[in-house]
Amino acid sequence: MSQPCPCGSADEYSLCCGRIVSGERVAPDPSHLMRSRYCAFVMKDADYLIKSWHPTCNAAAFRDDIIAGFANTRWLGLTIFEHTWSEAENTGYVSFIARFSEQGKNGAIIERSRFIKENGQWYYIDGTRPQLGRNDPCPCGSGKKFKKCCGQ
């Protein structure tokens, strides 16, 4: 039986992000790279995570930390609520919420990730995390307060 893609699409993993993670195809844009990186966290694929970071980030130096992070984390879902990129400038941004459970406590990573394209390949560079108050609107666009939505 086929496995659904953890990125949240309705497609099978092998027909969706699995093709990017395996190297069968390159991510056509930053949003697809973000989705494939989320899948790599779910599948505990440190090699792909390192490969998809820009080489100047020296992610291989953090391999042990990446692998240690897999131990107690269960990923619960990804919501991308904004993505923009410029082929002319070879830069892109993806804003997302990645939900997880770690040692029985639920949490979320809310980030605006920055990507760069070099030699036809998109790479993750870094990200910024907004400072949200409990009564701020949730960045996912639900219209709810952060504390009643993704901040739970």
From Swiss-Prot:
Alphabetical list of InterPro entries matching this protein: NTF2-like_dom_sf (IPR032710), SEC_C_motif (IPR004027), UPF0225 (IPR023006), YchJ-like_M (IPR048469)
Pfam families documented for this protein: SEC-C, YchJ_M-like
Protein family (similarity comment): Belongs to the UPF0225 family.
Designated name of the protein: UPF0225 protein YchJ
Organism field: Salmonella typhimurium (strain LT2 / SGSC1412 / ATCC 700720)
Gene expressing this chain: ychJ
